[in-house]
Amino acid sequence: DPMLAITARRGMVLNLTDKATAAIVIKCSNGWDAQNILDLANPLADFGLNKDDYSKLEIKNAEKYGCETAGIGLAKVARLLPAALIAHIADNDASVLDSWATRHGLLVVDAGDVFQYEHTQARTLKAVSEAKVPLLDANDTRIIAFRPFDGGLEHLAIVIGEENLKKDQPVLARLHSECFTGDLLASLKCDCGDQLRSAINEIALAGGGVLLYLAQEGRGIGLVNKLRAYELQDSGLDTIDANEQLGFDADERIYLPAAEMLRQLGFEKIRLMTNNPDKINSLAACGLNVVERVA
């Protein structure tokens, strides 16, 4: 029988679990259609399943590194809702599975590769192009584009006042997660655009530094899901609660890409412009020396 895998975060929102497990799996009952499944996965769906029926659902915890959790991981990579419809195949022989998948036009992915995907992307980042791009508040600017081996998400290093930077001295740095609505459209829902331009100006006034523009829209959930979260916020939820309603953690970002970019640029000591201690701790865990927090 097919099963629906959702994050434990989404399960707790639905009162289907009170445990901080990796994910939960729900058996799809006879007579269910796509709408019933969507009701459980998407808080914005029209509920066709009576909440009184939740107590009748057959639920189990998913293994932390099992295929159900990997299915959710694939959905996150694709910037979809963090849920997956799972069907087990009886034969576990790899050659048989490959043959079966080929006949049905399906892709075979190893669960381990899914769990390591974000780290693999970060570890394989390479600078692929660069150009001098004078900015309004920082005329001496070079932008370097980094891309992982699979051609996935691109991150940008905006290096300002390069001639003043010394590799043996701490570099003034800012990590900025991309925000289409704030950076480009001046959305009133956030101050990301103001933060971006202020950071560029401050780095230029300080003589130089680097701003990393990271492809982590919506705290790592992607633009489509961020718009879903905005719709939930319009009903009274804050940013964190809205993300959790969708089944995401409060913050899905990792900062290994930032650490790898700084390392490749030759900067091991950082004066980090942030009010977020998670960024400091994450860079330190990646082997960089954050010598100062600049508020």
Q: Predicted regions span which residues?
A:
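Catalytic domains of riboflavin
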Residues: 1-295
